[in-house]
A protein has these predicted regions:
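Active-site helix/loop module of the DD-peptidase/beta-lactamase fold
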Residues: 62-100, 126, 155-164, 168
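Active-site SXXK
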Residues: 43-68, 95, 147-151
């Protein structure tokens, strides 16, 4: 039995469902397990938030951005005068703290609009922000998504490339 099979067996004993696992060593895929076929779409909300937050921390450590940077610093192509006043005050920290000031979760749950919209950053930036950023907690997947986009813009590469050193983490179970 290989390590992945052992891991899956342990999780089954604990009634934990695992959909997908990969074991990488030195940029080589050593083992893989997939309970579902490739076209199946899954939501990975919480884990992606954690990895994205680490990516922001790495970018801060590298001097690519600061937590108090305004979100619009990374979107110079937008005219602030055409956007919601509270968006102009929103910082990276506000996004990390789930405090962007949105009126609701926007559309990042299960409605059809999510599948129809292709320009998610533009949708976010042109949305309403009736609340002052940082004053109201709203569990909103867009906060983490925008953090990931900001890391990409600051680092000049895809966020998963920027956080590639995380692939070396071992002994997670």
């Amino acid at each position: 039995m290989n390590c992945t099979e052992e891991f899956i067996a342990k999780m089954k004993q604990k009634d934990i469902v695992i959909n997908f696992v990969q074991a990488w060593r030195n940029d080589t895929l050593e083992e893989s397990y997939a309970r579902l076929d490739k076209p199946t779409r899954l939501h990975a909300y919480s884990v992606s938030k954690s990895v994205t937050s680490i990516g922001v921390g790495l970018a801060v450590q590298e001097g690519l951005l600061r937590l108090d940077d305004p979100v619009l610093r990374f979107y110079p192509e937008y005219d602030p005068a055409e956007l919601a006043p509270n968006l102009r005050r929103m910082t990276v920290r506000d996004l990390l703290m789930m405090g962007c000031g949105s009126k609701d979760k926007m559309f990042f749950w299960n409605d059809a609009q999510r599948l129809q919209c292709r320009a998610w950053q533009d949708y976010f930036l042109r949305n309403e922000f009736p609340y002052e950023p940082g004053t109201r907690f709203e569990y909103n997947n867009f906060n983490s998504y925008m953090c990931s986009c900001i890391v990409e813009r600051a680092a000049g590469c895809r966020s998963e490339e920027h956080t590639s050193e995380l692939q070396s983490l071992t002994n997670l179970v």
